[in-house]
Amino acid sequence: MSKVTGIVTELITPIVEEVGLELVDIEYKKEGSNWFLRVFIDNETGNIDIDDCRLVSEKLSEKLDEVDPIPTAYFLEVSSPGAERPLRKDKDFTKAVGRNVHITTKEPIEGATTFEGELVSYEDGKLTVKEAKKTYVISQEQIDTARMAIIF
């Protein structure tokens, strides 16, 4: 997590929770000559709508303008995490059991660093991912990125 995303996370988590939503992820990155602060929100049902995004965007914009934690000009975007939402917290992995996931690891496991298949179980920081021909057990510490996956 970058310094900016760490500071922004602390500032905006209470705002998102105050309106009954969950902060899923924050992304701060440069694309071309522009900086973007992307805030991904969700709720228990996974049904975020444009009104939720607008409400959070207005509240965040006000707070960010007041505190001004970002040294450069940027575009603020608030959205749902989408169908391929990132998996970061224990509850994200628990909710994803029985669904398809895409995992990349920091180091190879049995020669591979990318795994895509059904998350069969998640327990004590260990994921069991079943691909078409093989099942892997991956510890959370080994994960570089994890997200939901749509497999055709």
Curated annotation (Swiss-Prot):
Record keywords, A-Z: Cytoplasm, Ribosome biogenesis
Record GO cellular component, one term: cytosol
Cell location: Cytoplasm
Signal peptide start and end residues: none
Pfam families, A to Z: DUF150_C, RimP_N
Listed GO biological process terms: ribosomal small subunit assembly; translation
Family recorded in the similarity comment: Belongs to the RimP family.
NCBIfam families named in the record: PRK00092.1-2
Job description of the protein: Required for maturation of 30S ribosomal subunits.
Name of this chain's protein: Ribosome maturation factor RimP
Gene of this entry: rimP
